[in-house]
């Protein structure tokens, strides 16, 4: 399973760990992904999504039914 938010499309990015001695080693910054069940009132069922914290805030703001309609329109779910 890929580490990508189903709502925002956020995925891992790369960067450096930097030590006190300023040594740099490559690392990955992973998105804050959570598996979350959302109740869809129009369908009378739960939908399970893998979303980032930002994705959850988007769903809180716009509503799960609007976000699901966009995901289905774009073929993401």
Swiss-Prot record:
One of its GO terms (molecular function) is structural constituent of ribosome. GO terms for cellular component: cytosolic large ribosomal subunit. SUPFAM superfamilies: L28p-like. Residues 1-20 are annotated as: Disordered. GO terms for biological process: translation. InterPro entries: Ribosomal_bL28 (IPR026569), Ribosomal_bL28/bL31-like_sf (IPR034704), Ribosomal_bL28_bact-type (IPR001383), Ribosomal_bL28_sf (IPR037147). It comes from the Bacteria. Keywords: Ribonucleoprotein, Ribosomal protein. Belongs to the bacterial ribosomal protein bL28 family. PANTHER family: 39S RIBOSOMAL PROTEIN L28, MITOCHONDRIAL, LARGE RIBOSOMAL SUBUNIT PROTEIN BL28M. This is Large ribosomal subunit protein bL28. The lineage of its organism: Bacteria, Pseudomonadati, Pseudomonadota, Gammaproteobacteria, Pseudomonadales.
């Amino acid at each position: 399973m890929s580490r990508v938010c189903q709502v925002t499309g956020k995925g891992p990015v790369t960067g450096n760990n930097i030590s006190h001695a300023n040594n740099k080693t490559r690392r990955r910054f992973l998105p804050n992904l959570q598996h979350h069940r959302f109740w869809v009132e129009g369908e009378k069922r739960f939908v399970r999504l893998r979303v980032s914290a930002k994705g959850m805030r988007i769903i809180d703001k716009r509503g799960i039914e609007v976000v699901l309609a966009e995901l289905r329109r774009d073929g993401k779910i």
